[in-house]
Regions:
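Alpha-helical transmembrane segments of multi-pass membrane proteins
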Residues: 28-38, 66-85
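Core transmembrane alpha-helical segments of multi-pass membrane transporters/permeases
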Residues: 1-12
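Membrane-interface interhelical connector segments
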Residues: 11-26
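Helix-loop-helix connectors at the membrane interface of multi-pass transporters/channels
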Residues: 22, 58-65, 94-104
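Hydrophobic alpha-helical transmembrane segments of multi-pass integral membrane proteins
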Residues: 24-63
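Transmembrane helix-bundle signature of multi-pass membrane transporters/permeases
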Residues: 36-40, 55, 59, 74-81, ...
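Hydrophobic transmembrane alpha-helices that form the pore/transport pathway of multi-pass ion
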Residues: 48-78, 131-132
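Juxtamembrane and boundary regions of transmembrane helices in multi-pass small-molecule transporters
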Residues: 80-134
């Protein structure tokens, strides 16, 4: 997106690039974990995934990072879905919390958290398999 591309020549881009390069040399699982943490943290702070994911994807598909295109794509798609669902600022979580008259944080973390913990474990396994096959 436009906002993600605007961040490409900033200090954030260089810091993220060094973290992504460092973690990709250690383990694909560490890289996936850091991508999930970063995008989810940005989402919780109110920065939409459409700003963060293009920046991450651009860094993941660079020649310096030795991971496949399918692995990069899955990481970004899964992280977008996870961070959007866990963010209490997400419109869907706000609507649900108002309908059931419950705090948005409770809806995001307590109700969705158990489901997404199990899905995230499966996603780590899937990334591992994709990386081996690539």
């Amino acid at each position: 997106g436009l906002l993600g591309n605007a961040l490409l020549s900033t200090k954030l881009d260089s810091v993220l690039k060094s973290i992504i390069l460092w973690s990709s040399e250690i383990s694909i699982m560490l890289l996936f974990f850091l991508v999930i943490c970063f995008v989810t943290l940005m989402s919780i702070m109110g920065i939409h995934q459409i700003v963060v994911i293009p920046l991450i994807l651009t860094l993941l598909i660079s020649p310096d990072v030795n991971i496949g295109l399918f692995v990069s794509a899955f990481m970004c798609i899964f992280t977008w879905m996870l961070s959007a669902s866990l963010s209490p600022l997400n419109v869907l979580n706000v609507i649900i919390s108002r309908c059931v008259k419950t705090n948005g944080v409770r809806v995001a973390y307590h109700w969705n958290g158990k489901y997404f913990l199990s899905i995230t474990i499966l996603a780590f396994f899937y990334v591992f398999v994709l990386d081996i096959l690539d």
